[in-house]
C-alpha cells in the first residue's frame, strides 16, 4: 500500500507531496542506522562473549539451569552466544519489527530456533507465566541498551522493570556493572561550541546578548569522537574522576540522583567543559572490561578499539568559572531517566541527595544555533573572510538583503556602512535571537528583520527600495547535505524582480568538490559483516542492502569528517558549479568526467563538499580547509557536515594512473536533487 506524504524539500524550500510505500520509514531508519558498526566492533563482541560464558558457568556452578533474557537483542548475536555457551534457553526481546524479523532469520540460519524465542515487544510489555511471552523468569540478564551517554536509550527504566518482573532475584547480569568517568577541562576549541564570543568588525565590537552569556545552554549531550580532539586543544583541570557505578545484577532505580566527587585542581584556569565516558565490566570481578575511553588515554593509542555506536560525551558547564591551582573543587553529576548533566562548586558542602534541575536553554540561541553553528559563528578566520568580501562590495548607498538562518551577515553589513539592510528570518525563534544581538549592541534600527519567506517578499517590504546586494553565508537549519544550501539559489530566483539590474550576489557561485578517500574506520558503518564471532549474520547485511536499494538511487549521506580520519586517493576535483548571478535554470545541469587516482589504497567512497566564491578573490570551503598532504592526510571544516558517497564494496587502487574516479552528476532544478554516480574505472 502506498500513501502520499508531505516532505519539506531542504533545497527548494517547497513541500513536496510524494507517493511512498508504507514501509518507507522502516527502510529509512534501517538505511540510516549503523547496525553494521556494532557487528564490526570486535572488542565489544569478544568482551560480551567472554562475559556471557562466565555468567553461564557461574549459574551452572550453582546447580541451576541457565535461562537467559536478552533485552534489545538486535541481530540476536548475544542470544546465540548465550546458547553456544551452554544456556538452556534464551528469550530475546526486540521492539523494532524489521530488526526482530532479521533476528528470527539469523537465529534460524544458525540453527538456534529451538533454543531462542524472539519477542517483538518492548521489554516493559513482556509477560511471564504459562500463557505469557516467557514461561519463567530468567537467571541471566544480557542487555545492550546503551548509548554514548549510557542511559539515553532508557536503560535505567528497562533494567528497573526487568528486575521487578522478568528476572530472578540474584540473577547474573552481562554486563555486570557500568561506571561513568569525567574530566574537567579548559578548552577554547570546545567552549566556542557553547557560547557566542565578541566579534570585531572594522573597529566595532559586536557583543553577545547577556541572556546568551547567562544561559545554561542546550540540554542535550554533545557526543563526538573525542579521540579526534587534539590533546593540545584542552588543559586538564581535574584528574579522570570516577563519578558513579550502576550494578545491573541488582534492582536498578531510574529515579533522579546526584553524585559528587571532590578533587584538587591540577592547574589554574577556566573550568568550562566536562569530558565524559563510561566502561562496562562484563563480570563481577571486573576482569572483562569494555571501555569507551578516548584513544589519548591509552598507553598505546593504536590499541584503541574504534566504534561509532558508542562515543564520548562533552558537557558544557552552565558558565565558565575561574579556578586556582590546588583549589578544592567538587564536580557533581546528576541524572534522570535518560540524561546526565554536570555542575561545579568551589565551596565545602554535603553531598546533594536530590538532583538539581536539568539545565535548559532560556535564551533561545542554543535552540536556534547548533553547537557546530556556534563554533562557526565564533570562527575568526571565517568571519574575516565574510567581512573582507562585504567590505569590497558595499557602498554607502547599498541596499542589502540577507538570506540565511540566524545569520550575523546583515549585522556586519550595517556595521560596514550600508544604507539599508534587510534580513529574511522566517523562523520566529531565529528572528528573536538576532533581535537580541541588535538590541544588545544598540543596533535595533540598523537591520530590518522580515519574518517572511523569499517568495512572499514585495517591494513594499523593502520600503520601496530595490536590492543592490543580495547576500547569504549560505546557512540553513534544514540543510543536511552540503548541496541543500542551494536553497539560497532558489531564494535568489524568487526575489529576482526585486534586484537592481547591476545587483551584486554574495556568494557569486558555489562549486561542489569531490575526492576519493580511504577511511581509517568510518567504512565499518556501511560495509557487510558476513560472520561475527563465528555466527552467520548475513541476513542483517541483506536487510541493510534491501533498505539502501529501496531508494531510487544510491545516495550520499552527511558526516562530520573531522571526526573520521581518511586519506585522499585522488586530488580534490570540482565536479559541478552553480552560478548564483543567474537564476535557477529550467533545464537540468549535467557534469561528467574523471580524475586519476594518485594514491594507493582501499577506496571506500567519495567525500563531497561545497566551496563558496564570495567574490572573485575570496572563497570559503565547507570541506577541506588545507591542501591535501603528500601522504593524503585531510583536514576538514569542523563546523559543517560533508557528504559521503559510499561504494557498495571497497576497491583497491594502485595510484600509478591505471585507475580513474569517474563521475556523472545531474542537478534537477525542479526537485533540487543532485543525482550522482561514482565509479572506479580503468584508464
UniProtKB/Swiss-Prot annotation:
GO terms for molecular function: histone H4R3 methyltransferase activity; histone methyltransferase activity; protein-arginine N-methyltransferase activity; protein-arginine omega-N monomethyltransferase activity; protein-arginine omega-N symmetric methyltransferase activity; S-adenosylmethionine-dependent methyltransferase activity. SUPFAM superfamilies: S-adenosyl-L-methionine-dependent methyltransferases. It catalyses: L-arginyl-[protein] + S-adenosyl-L-methionine = N(omega)-methyl-L-arginyl-[protein] + S-adenosyl-L-homocysteine + H(+). PANTHER family: PROTEIN ARGININE N-METHYLTRANSFERASE, PROTEIN ARGININE N-METHYLTRANSFERASE 7. One of its GO terms (cellular component) is cytosol. The lineage of its organism: Eukaryota, Metazoa, Chordata, Craniata, Vertebrata. It holds the Pfam family PrmA. One of its GO terms (biological process) is cytoskeleton organization. It is found in: Cytoplasm, Cytosol; Nucleus. This is Protein arginine N-methyltransferase 7. Belongs to the class I-like SAM-binding methyltransferase superfamily. Protein arginine N-methyltransferase family. PRMT7 subfamily. The gene is prmt7. Its EC number is 2.1.1.321.
Amino acid at each position: 500500500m502506498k500513501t502520499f506524504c508531505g516532505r519539506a524539500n531542504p533545497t527548494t524550500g517547497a513541500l513536496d507531496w510524494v507517493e511512498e510505500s508504507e514501509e518507507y520509514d522502516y527502510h529509512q531508519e534501517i538505511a540510516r542506522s549503523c547496525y553494521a558498526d556494532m557487528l564490526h566492533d570486535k572488542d565489544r563482541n569478544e568482551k560480551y562473549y567472554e562475559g556471557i560464558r562466565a555468567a553461564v558457568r557461574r549459574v551452572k556452578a550453582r546447580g541451576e539451569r541457565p535461562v537467559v533474557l536478552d533485552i534489545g537483542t538486535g541481530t540476536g548475536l548475544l542470544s546465540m552466544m548465550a546458547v553456544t555457551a551452554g544456556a538452556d534457553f534464551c528469550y530475546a526481546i526486540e521492539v523494532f519489527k524489521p530488526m526482530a524479523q532479521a533476528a528470527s532469520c539469523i537465529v534460524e540460519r544458525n540453527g538456534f530456533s529451538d533454543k531462542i524465542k524472539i519477542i517483538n515487544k518492548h521489554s516493559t510489555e513482556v509477560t511471564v507465566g504459562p500463557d505469557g511471552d516467557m514461561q519463567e523468569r530468567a537467571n541471566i540478564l544480557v542487555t545492550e541498551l546503551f548509548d554514548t551517554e549510557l542511559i539515553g536509550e532508557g536503560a535505567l527504566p528497562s533494567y528497573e522493570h526487568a528486575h521487578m518482573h522478568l528476572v530472578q532475584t540474584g540473577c547474573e547480569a552481562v554486563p555486570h556493572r557500568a561506571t561513568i568517568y569525567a574530566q574537567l577541562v579548559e578548552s577554547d576549541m570546545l567552549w566556542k561550541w557553547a557560547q557566542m564570543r565578541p566579534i570585531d568588525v572594522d573597529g566595532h565590537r559586536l557583543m553577545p546578548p547577556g541572556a546568551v552569556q547567562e544561559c545554561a545552554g542546550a540540554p542535550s549531550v554533545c557526543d563526538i569522537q573525542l579521540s579526534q580532539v587534539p590533546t593540545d586543544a584542552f588543559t586538564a583541570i581535574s584528574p579522570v574522576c570516577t563519578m558513579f557505578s550502576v550494578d545491573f545484577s541488582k534492582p536498578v532505580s531510574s529515579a533522579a540522583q546526584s553524585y559528587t566527587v571532590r578533587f584538587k585542581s591540577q592547574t589554574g584556569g577556566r573550568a568550562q567543559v566536562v569530558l565524559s565516558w563510561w566502561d562496562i565490566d562484563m563480570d563481577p570481578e571486573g576482569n572483562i572490561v569494555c571501555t569507551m575511553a578516548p584513544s589519548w588515554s591509552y598507553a598505546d593509542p593504536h590499541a584503541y578499539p574504534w566504534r561509532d555506536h558508542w562515543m564520548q560525551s562533552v558537557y558544557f558547564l552552565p558558565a565558565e568559572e575561574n579556578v586556582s591551582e590546588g583549589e578544592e573543587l567538587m564536580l557533581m553529576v546528576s541524572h534522570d531517566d535518560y540524561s546526565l548533566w554536570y555542575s561545579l562548586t568551589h565551596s565545602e558542602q554535603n553531598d546533594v541527595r536530590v538532583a538539581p534541575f536539568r539545565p535548559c536553554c532560556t535564551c533561545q540561541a542554543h535552540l536556534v544555533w547548533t553547537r557546530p553553528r556556534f563554533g562557526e559563528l565564533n570562527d575568526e578566520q571565517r568571519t574575516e573572510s565574510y567581512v573582507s568580501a562585504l567590505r569590497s562590495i558595499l557602498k554607502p548607498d547599498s541596499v542589502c538583503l540577507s538570506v540565511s538562518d540566524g545569520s550575523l551577515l546583515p549585522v556586519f553589513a550595517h556595521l560596514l556602512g550600508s544604507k539599508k539592510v534587510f534580513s529574511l528570518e522566517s523562523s520566529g525563534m531565529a528572528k528573536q535571537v538576532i533581535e537580541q544581538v541588535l538590541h544588545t549592541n544598540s543596533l535595533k534600527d540598523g537591520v530590518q528583520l522580515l519574518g517572511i519567506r523569499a517568495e512572499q517578499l514585495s517591494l513594499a517590504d523593502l520600503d520601496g527600495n530595490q536590492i543592490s546586494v543580495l547576500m547569504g553565508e549560505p546557512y540553513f537549519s534544514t540543510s543536511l547535505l552540503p548541496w541543500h544550501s542551494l536553497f539560497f539559489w532558489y531564494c535568489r530566483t524568487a526575489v529576482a524582480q526585486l534586484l537592481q539590474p547591476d545587483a551584486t550576489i554574495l556568494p557569486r557561485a558555489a562549486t561542489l568538490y569531490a575526492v576519493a578517500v580511504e577511511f581509517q574506520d568510518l567504512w565499518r558503518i556501511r560495509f557487510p559483516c558476513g560472520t561475527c564471532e563465528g555466527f552467520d549474520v548475513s541476513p542483517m547485511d541483506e536487510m541493510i542492502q534491501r533498505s539502501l536499494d529501496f531508494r531510487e538511487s544510491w545516495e550520499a549521506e552527511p558526516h562530520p569528517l573531522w571526526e573520521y580520519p581518511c586519506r585522499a586517493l585522488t586530488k580534490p576535483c570540482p565536479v559541478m558549479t552553480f552560478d548564483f548571478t543567474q537564476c535557477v535554470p529550467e533545464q537540468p545541469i549535467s557534469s561528467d568526467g574523471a580524475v586519476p587516482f594518485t594514491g594507493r589504497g582501499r577506496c571506500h567512497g567519495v567525500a563531497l563538499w561545497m566551496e563558496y566564491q564570495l567574490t572573485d578573490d575570496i572563497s570559503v570551503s565547507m570541506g577541506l580547509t588545507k591542501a591535501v598532504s603528500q601522504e593524503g592526510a585531510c583536514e576538514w571544516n569542523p563546523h559543517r557536515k560533508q557528504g559521503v558517497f559510499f561504494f557498495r564494496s571497497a576497491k583497491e587502487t594502485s595510484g600509478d594512473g591505471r585507475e580513474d574516479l569517474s563521475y556523472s552528476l545531474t542537478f534537477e532544478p525542479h526537485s533540487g536533487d543532485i543525482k550522482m554516480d561514482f565509479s572506479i574505472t580503468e584508464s
